[in-house]
A protein has these predicted regions:
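General small-molecule cofactor/ligand-binding pocket signal
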Residues: 85-87, 135-137, 152
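Active-site neighborhoods of enzymes that stabilize oxyanions during catalysis
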Residues: 148-156
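Flexible, polar/low-complexity N-terminal or interdomain linker segments that lie immediately upstream
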Residues: 1-75
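Short, structured coil segments at secondary-structure junctions
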Residues: 80-82, 130, 147
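Alpha-helical scaffolding within the catalytic cores
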Residues: 53, 89-96
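Structured helix-beta-strand junction loops
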Residues: 63-64, 102, 147
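Catalytic cysteine-centered active loop of the rhodanese-like fold, especially the PTP/DSP P-loop
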Residues: 93-144
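Mid-length scaffold segments of soluble, non-membrane domains
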Residues: 66, 71-88, 97-99
Length: 156
């Protein structure tokens, strides 16, 4: 193993992975995180795409601006960030007209190890969506939940 490979070695993937952190029912404020799934992602989704954190997501939601959850239905685990709109990655290009090209839109998925939002951004770029109007929340559900920020039941 060369020096570069030793930093990429990860825990073996479990048979049934849990992509969204789980609240530990009897321990308020504690979540369990499964580190055995996913891919290592870059900090920037693509050239011209701004990467944002939780404060920007909160401000976007407070201002009534769009925050899009691109997670496939089977990867949502029944929860989402309140105020977000679900447009699964499989539908993102078909539903491009639901996006407001005049306002910055934040896209997110399950977190730093989840490729869904980066892939969705690349699909939208290829479809002609303006890079300067797409922001990438790399932390996704993983960071949102591990910071103790509120989530709601996902009925979409």
């Amino acid at each position: 193993m060369d020096k570069g490979e030793q930093f990429l070695e990860r825990n073996p993937k479990r048979d049934k992975v849990q992509m969204v952190p789980q609240h530990i029912s009897d321990k308020k404020g504690l979540v369990a995180v499964d580190v055995t799934w996913g891919e290592i992602q870059t900090i920037q989704a693509a050239d011209g795409i701004r990467t944002v954190g939780e404060r920007e997501v909160i401000k976007q939601l407070q201002n009534g601006l769009p925050v899009i959850d691109v997670r496939a239905p089977g990867t949502r685990n029944g929860i989402r960030i309140a105020g977000t709109k679900a447009i699964p990655i499989s539908d993102i290009v078909d539903r491009i007209d639901e996006l407001n090209r005049s306002k910055p839109t934040i896209f997110f998925c399950n977190g730093p190890q989840c490729p869904q939002s980066q892939k969705a951004i690349h699909m939208l770029l290829k479809a002609g969506y303006p890079a300067e109007k797409m922001w990438y929340y790399r932390g996704g559900m993983h960071d949102w939940m591990t910071l103790g920020l509120p989530v709601v039941e996902d009925n979409e």
